[in-house]
């Protein structure tokens, strides 16, 4: 008897999850929160394009592990701001993992109302310490009044634009962590036309051609 496509898909996702958690181990409680988040995302994906459909079979390694690896680069950070959170990567994933860190809080900034609604539901369902801001990025970072330890972004904009978004927060002591792809060197070269930065590059733990750009000092060129 042939397996149905649903059964095959379920086995593929289960294998991908196992591979992801081997790369980026989490507590049982965090795993349960992530399971609820993934179930919700798959439900909403049918009506709202939250991630590229082609990446769904590898959701755990492609998106969740990719997000979780940021935690090792800011192990003491409690207050995070995720710019352009979209489907919740890395923001919701980080919030799920940080739920066990006293005082932790992840601010999810999203300008599209439908995606912001999804993010709110994801935070509700998982019980993760997240706050959703329906806002343009520039509006909220310029008015930010609280402390920030880390600012993140993934699949949002070219690096030189991300640096501009993050500048007000980095100047106040935040560390910027940007998930980028194979064109990272070209993006860094372009960024130096506008900004004085001393970035650190980390190869993505998930393999492929992914990179993490870490920046803790930003100055504009005169």
From Swiss-Prot:
Q: Which UniProt keywords apply?
A: Cytoplasm, Methyltransferase, rRNA processing, S-adenosyl-L-methionine, Transferase
Gene name of this polypeptide = rsmG
Output this protein's name. Ribosomal RNA small subunit methyltransferase G
User: Which Pfam families does the record match to this protein?
Assistant: GidB
Summarize where S-adenosyl-L-methionine binds, as residue positions.
Answer: 84, 89, 141-142, 154
- Give GO terms: molecular function aspect only: rRNA (guanine-N7-)-methyltransferase activity
Query: Which taxonomic lineage is given here?
Result: Bacteria, Pseudomonadati, Pseudomonadota, Alphaproteobacteria, Hyphomicrobiales
Where found, per UniProt?
A: Cytoplasm
State its role.
Answer: Specifically methylates the N7 position of guanine in position 527 of 16S rRNA.
Q: What class of enzyme is it?
A: transferase
Spell out the family assignment given in the record's similarity comment: Belongs to the methyltransferase superfamily. RNA methyltransferase RsmG family.
Query: PANTHER family under this entry?
Result: S-ADENOSYL-L-METHIONINE-DEPENDENT METHYLTRANSFERASES SUPERFAMILY PROTEIN
Q: Might you give the EC number(s) for this enzyme?
A: 2.1.1.170
Q: Which residues form the signal peptide?
A: none
Q: What's the source species for this entry?
A: Bradyrhizobium sp. (strain BTAi1 / ATCC BAA-1182)
* Gene3D superfamilies, A to Z: Vaccinia Virus protein VP39 (3.40.50.150)
